[in-house]
Each structure stands twice: as structure tokens, then as C-alpha cells.
């Protein structure tokens, strides 16, 4: 009788384990949402004319000093929206102190840039063009002068901003680029999984998600972008070695913002190294291990690290080739100025 009772208890325990595992998994999954098809804006209607204009402007070299750089120079759309360099070369080969984050899925983030200094992709688009270390244009007025001198852009701005007496403005430049970027989304098998298709991920990837979640990674990396929705201190539980960049503090001058950075999205993370704001971490395995040590206070085993990396690779989406295809750019006018 005692043996039978013991066997029955063991069988019941085994039966309950998958149920408990599913319950744990479901509780973590509630922290995520599938990617939307676009990131809508209350202040920037996404019309076809505006998106088409934004696509042209994204690839436009004439909005840089020397006419050699465009948004796509650092945020290459055929390479998941970045250039795989620690620092991107700007005007005359100058490099900044932070790596170029991906433009894919960026519009759904809480803010733009590593320090969050731009509240939207529309505002972000206006920054690099005038930065002397990036595209190097002398002023917003000069950018407008260039655009107004190109007949094709005169017509494109009229179509994108109908009813405006003076549609070619620097703010409208930002709105057009922003409209294009708001549909730069890369859904993956992870989204299918979140929508209920439990066959979308392999058993190893599902196990990797469980490891990722139970380790505590989901505290910061959650939501539709698997990150991008909060700021966090780099070196949260253990001081990050040789950290000089003061992060968000450099934008806000608020003492408590020192060493805080926008939490990066993990979408397409397997394709967007090197990692961190300074590109100092070369591999995904090293990044996961360091996050465990410095952000979570945990020494992840090699098996745990590998398991998490397996899950992260499932976040790789498909680049929308037709949407990002470089359009034919309008020809310069007879008096188009050069910076």
C-alpha cells in the first residue's frame, strides 16, 4: 500500500511539473507584446506621400557637408539599421563617443539616442544633419535652402504636407523621415509565439526564454521591442569597469541620471553588434555574461549563457526589402548649393 501511494505521488508530481512550468512561462509572457505593424503618432499622420518623401530623405547625401553621408551611412537598412562598428565615421572621418543604434523598431521606444535626449524619431532625425561630427550641415536654414532648390523635392513636400503655405521646413524634414521610420519594423518568430503559435519557437529557444526570464533579464527587457522602454544604470549591482560616459546625465544634468542609459531593444540583437553605447563588447555571449554579472549580480553558467543566446537569436526579424529599397532621388536644380 505504501509503495502504491509513493508511486501515485511521484506520477502526480511529474504531471504537475509541466503545468507549473507553463504557468511560470505565461506569467513572464504577459510582460511582452507582439510588434505593431507601425508606430503611430498623434502629431505625425503616416500618409503614403510623407513616407515616400521620408524614404528619399533617409538616403539623401546632399544633406551632408561634402555630399557623402546620409542617414543610411550609419544606419544601414540592409544591415538591420546600423553599421556593425563601435563608432560611426562622420564628416571628414570624425567619430563620436557612442555607437549608432538601429533605426528598426526604434519608433516604439520611450525616446531616442542612448541618453534619450530626443523624445521622438521626428526630433532625432533633425540632430545628426546639423552635428559637425556627423553630417555637418551649417544650419537648418541651409538644409531648407538645399531642398527648395531641388524641383523634385518641392513637389514631394507639397504632396506630403498638403495645404501648407510653406511645406519645406526643417520640422517637416524631421516629420517625413520620422514617418518613414515609424514603419521600420521587423517581426520575428517571437511575435508568432506571442500570438499563440507555440510551435513558432523550438524547444531550445523556449527553454532559453525561461532562462532569460528567470535570470531577471525581463525586468528591463520587456514590451514589444524587448527593451527600449526605460532607463537603467550601467553597472547596477556592480560598478561597470572603466565607465567614463555619464550617460543620460550629459543630456539632463540631473545627478541621479549619471551612468543611466536607455535600455536597448533586443530585437535583431544577434545582427547588431558590437554592443553597448561604446561598442566595447564584441560578442553576444560576452554581453549576456556581463549583464548577468554587472546588472543582475549573477554568475551565469556557460550553459545558461548559451541558452539565453539561443532565445535571443529568435528575435531576429525579416528586413522588409521592398519597403527599404533605395528610391530614385530627384536631380539637383541649377542653383542647388553645396555645403
Model-derived features: where do they sit?
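Bacterial N-terminal signal peptides that target proteins for export
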Residues: 1-7
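Cleavable N-terminal signal peptides
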Residues: 7-9, 19
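Short, linear, compositionally biased motifs with a strong N-terminal bias
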Residues: 10-13, 339
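Periplasmic c-type cytochrome electron-transfer domains
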Residues: 20-339
Amino acid at each position: 500500500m505504501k509503495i502504491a501511494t509513493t508511486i501515485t505521488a511521484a506520477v502526480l508530481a511529474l504531471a504537475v511539473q509541466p503545468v507549473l512550468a507553463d504557468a511560470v512561462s505565461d506569467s513572464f509572457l504577459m510582460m511582452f507584446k507582439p510588434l505593431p505593424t507601425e508606430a503611430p503618432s498623434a502629431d505625425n499622420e503616416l500618409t503614403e506621400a510623407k513616407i515616400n518623401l521620408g524614404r528619399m530623405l533617409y538616403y539623401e547625401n546632399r544633406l551632408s557637408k561634402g555630399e557623402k553621408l546620409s542617414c543610411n551611412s550609419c544606419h544601414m537598412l540592409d544591415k538591420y539599421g546600423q553599421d556593425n562598428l563601435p563608432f560611426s565615421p562622420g564628416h571628414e572621418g570624425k567619430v563620436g563617443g557612442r555607437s549608432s543604434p538601429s533605426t528598426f523598431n526604434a519608433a516604439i521606444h520611450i525616446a531616442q539616442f542612448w541618453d534619450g535626449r530626443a523624445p521622438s524619431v521626428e526630433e532625432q532625425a533633425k540632430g545628426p544633419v546639423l552635428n559637425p561630427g556627423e553630417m555637418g550641415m551649417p544650419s537648418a536654414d541651409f538644409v531648407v535652402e538645399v531642398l527648395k532648390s531641388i524641383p523634385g523635392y518641392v513637389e514631394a513636400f507639397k504632396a506630403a504636407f498638403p495645404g501648407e503655405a510653406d511645406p519645406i521646413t526643417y520640422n517637416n524634414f524631421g516629420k517625413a523621415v520620422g514617418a518613414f521610420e515609424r514603419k521600420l519594423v521587423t517581426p520575428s518568430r517571437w511575435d508568432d509565439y506571442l500570438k499563440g503559435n507555440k510551435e513558432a519557437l523550438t524547444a531550445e529557444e523556449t527553454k532559453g526564454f525561461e532562462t532569460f526570464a528567470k535570470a531577471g533579464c525581463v525586468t528591463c527587457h520587456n514590451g514589444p521591442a524587448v527593451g527600449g522602454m526605460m532607463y537603467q544604470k550601467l553597472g547596477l549591482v556592480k560598478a561597470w569597469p572603466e565607465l567614463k560616459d555619464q550617460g543620460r546625465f550629459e543630456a539632463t544634468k540631473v545627478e541621479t541620471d549619471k551612468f543611466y542609459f536607455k535600455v536597448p531593444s533586443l530585437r535583431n540583437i544577434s545582427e547588431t553588434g558590437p554592443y553597448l553605447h561604446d561598442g566595447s563588447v564584441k560578442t553576444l555571449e560576452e554581453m549576456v555574461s556581463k549583464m548577468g554579472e554587472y546588472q543582475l549580480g549573477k554568475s551565469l553558467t556557460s550553459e545558461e549563457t548559451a541558452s539565453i543566446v539561443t532565445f535571443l537569436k529568435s528575435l531576429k526579424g525579416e528586413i522588409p526589402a521592398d519597403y527599404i529599397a533605395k528610391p530614385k532621388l530627384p536631380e539637383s536644380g541649377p542653383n542647388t548649393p553645396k555645403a
